[in-house]
Swiss-Prot record:
UniProt superkingdom: Bacteria
Name the record gives this protein: Ribonuclease PH
Similarity comment text for this entry: Belongs to the RNase PH family.
Lineage, highest ranks first: Bacteria, Pseudomonadati, Pseudomonadota, Alphaproteobacteria, Rickettsiales
Organism this protein belongs to: Rickettsia prowazekii (strain Madrid E)
Catalysis: reaction(s): tRNA(n+1) + phosphate = tRNA(n) + a ribonucleoside 5'-diphosphate
Task of the protein: Phosphorolytic 3'-5' exoribonuclease that plays an important role in tRNA 3'-end maturation. Removes nucleotide residues following the 3'-CCA terminus of tRNAs; can also add nucleotides to the ends of RNA molecules by using nucleoside diphosphates as substrates, but this may not be physiologically important. Probably plays a role in initiation of 16S rRNA degradation (leading to ribosome degradation) during starvation.
Amino acid sequence: MRQSGRKSNQLRPISLELSPLINAEGSCLIKIGNTHVMCSATCETTVPPFLRGQNQGWITAEYGMIPGSTSHRIKREAALGKQGGRTQEIQRLIGRAMRCVINLQKLGERQIIIDCDVINADGGTRTAAITGSYVALHLAIRSLMKKRILKVNPLISQIAAISCGIYKGNAVLDLDYLEDSDAEVDSNFVFACNGNLIEVQGTAEKEPFSEEQFLAMLKLAKSGVVELFKLQNQVLIAAE
């Protein structure tokens, strides 16, 4: 039995608040249980040096946790003078994921920066950030098209992500912090809406896990992202 009382295939309560930030082209506050992440997408008319003159766009991401997002205050990385390895890993993951669902040539010579700020952390912050960032990106593209900055929609797919793990010997979906800190296996799955995988991260915390356990987690993850895709579509259609 999970401490939260949830079934093994049950997500935490989820909400997506659209456009909480008035200045970004697109923004979304995603809440999955007690994990809350502010995601925004901002467009710039410059691209990285390696893309100048290529008539191609770029998407990059930044990720951070505010000091009061966990039980013990986190020092601001800006105050420390450098980003931690975890931060760099997660923001690269978010950037890679977003680039998988957009035609960079159709984006033109401009860059969209995804910013993810964890307001409250209770497990699954990186997967929540990806799911919320897609919504922010979608809204940003919609805004650019309404302004006729873009003539063709460069989005080619939809993206969502969820965590799974082996907890007390069982495959479970959407781990919270208590489960994650005591799980035998911790994994993250990033999906396109056609069911294809974009990225998989999996780590055995105590002992190696079997192919059977991996497939059990994959099955749970696929069922979970279906719900996430439905919610993304519902809120985006309602905001048209």
